[in-house]
Regions:
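Beta-lactam-recognizing serine transpeptidase/beta-lactamase-like catalytic domain environment
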Residues: 12-23, 38, 64-106, 111-334, ...
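Conserved, well-ordered alpha-helix/loop/beta-strand core segments that scaffold catalytic motifs
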Residues: 19-62
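Short, charged, low-complexity patches
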Residues: 39, 43, 231, 344-356
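A helicase ATPase "motif cassette" and its flanking acidic/Ser/Thr-rich regulatory loops
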Residues: 46, 158, 352
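Short, gly/Ser/Thr-rich active-site loops of penicillin-recognizing serine hydrolases
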Residues: 257, 349-365
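Short beta-strands and strand-coil junctions in structured, solvent-facing domains, enriched
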Residues: 339-340
Length: 365
């Protein structure tokens, strides 16, 4: 039952308070009552951990969610702050998980590799030459982060090391139609099938013909926008042997499934996401009690009418755990962390680490 008061909590179907500035849910109230999928313990703990991450990184705000990777049930969905800090006279309710659309950056790289495998544009053992650490596309130069040069690498390493040049070389193998169709297959640019949601499908470059720079941009998560629920939906395919699950907030809602990958290709991507933690861009999580598979994402923030803002980033981490037998998907996104420490592996990934410890202690894992 949803508490319809103006306090900052709702009640679960057990009558327990679910904290986290979530008056948003009061809009879902109906005369019959609703059985929400939200879990009291996870909702409260995730809200506290998100607040800590935002404070530690001196960020503007952020959001996080936990989804059951098998059923699609949203177990926790929090954002902070849920008001406009520039207007102290008026509290403006805002659920960033739903309302914040951003360019997801490198979180899209596994989707691009998965599509290339599906279309036989590459093989799992294809060698991609990323020398000399940059590539010229349609008159634009694109370089590896930090001036790195990964040399000759495999598709799995393109994911784990988050190679811009590697994913660009794969992306330009797609036709314009193939690139767009692959992203739509994984739900990007598509509405979520949630009846309570004031739906927005995000944006994607709509030029009939995509130049190489356009395809590369889409391949590494620019020129399209997504919210965290869409990302959780996409990553569920890697957790479920190629079957994508539609997120749901009401227990009685139907679980909607769609196969988007073969079991073999999904397993390959999941293993690549495990390597991101073992030896890649989120290696700070490799000694955690629960084995995590995941992908870091750090994108420059685009501001309408201004363009890409200097030293303003969206730092994200998409995770699947336990990596060997997935049960949960968690997406964390931090808005404008300190520009001196802004990578997703440093800012967002620690939230996942702390939550998995908490979930193991409480026997969720």
């Amino acid at each position: 039952v949803i508490d319809s008061s103006k306090s900052t909590f709702i009640r679960s179907n057990k009558g327990e308070k679910l904290y986290g500035n979530l008056d948003f849910y009061s809009n879902l109230e109906n005369s019959d009552g609703l059985s929400l999928t939200l879990d009291t313990n996870l909702q409260f703990k995730l809200f506290e951990e998100l607040k800590t991450a935002i404070s530690d990184s001196k960020a503007l705000g952020g959001s996080a969610l936990i989804m059951d990777s098998v059923s699609g049930e949203i177990l926790a969905m929090v954002s902070y702050p849920s008001f406009n800090p520039n207007n102290s006279q008026r509290v403006i309710e805002r659920n960033r998980v739903i309302e914040d659309f951003f360019e997801p950056g490198s979180l899209i790289k596994p989707i691009t590799v998965a599509g290339a495998l599906k279309l036989n544009l590459i093989k799992k053992d294809s060698v991609i030459d990323t020398n000399p650490g940059f590539i010229n596309l349609s008159g634009f130069k694109r370089s590896e982060a930090g001036g790195k040069n990964f040399g000759k690498i495999l598709p799995s390493e393109i994911i784990s090391k988050s190679s811009q040049v590697g994913i660009a070389k794969i992306s330009i193998k797609f036709s314009s139609e193939q690139m767009r169709n692959n992203l739509r297959l994984f739900g990007f640019g598509e509405y979520l099938n949630i009846n309570w949601l004031n739906n927005n499908n995000g944006r994607m470059i709509d030029a009939p013909r995509l130049y190489d720079i356009d395809k590369a941009s889409l391949g590494y998560g620019y020129s399209l926008t997504s919210n965290s629920l869409q990302l959780a939906r996409a990553y569920s395919a890697f957790a479920n042997e190629g079957v994508m699950i539609e997120p749901k907030l009401f227990i009685n809602d139907e679980t909607i499934r769609k196969r988007v990958l073969t079991k073999s290709n999904a397993s390959f991507i999941l293993d690549s996401l495990r390597m991101t933690i073992l030896e890649g861009t989120a290696s700070n999580l490799k000694n955690e009690e629960v084995e995590i598979a995941g992908k870091t994402g750090t994108s420059e923030k685009y501001i309408e009418g201004v363009g890409y803002a200097s030293e303003k980033y969206i730092s994200s981490f998409a995770s699947i755990f336990p990596a060997q037998k997935p049960k949960f998907i968690m997406i964390v996104s931090i808005d404008e962390p300190d520009p001196n420490k802004y990578f997703g592996g440093d800012v967002s990934a620690p939230v996942v680490a702390r939550m998995t410890k908490f979930m193991k202690r409480l026997k969720y894992l």
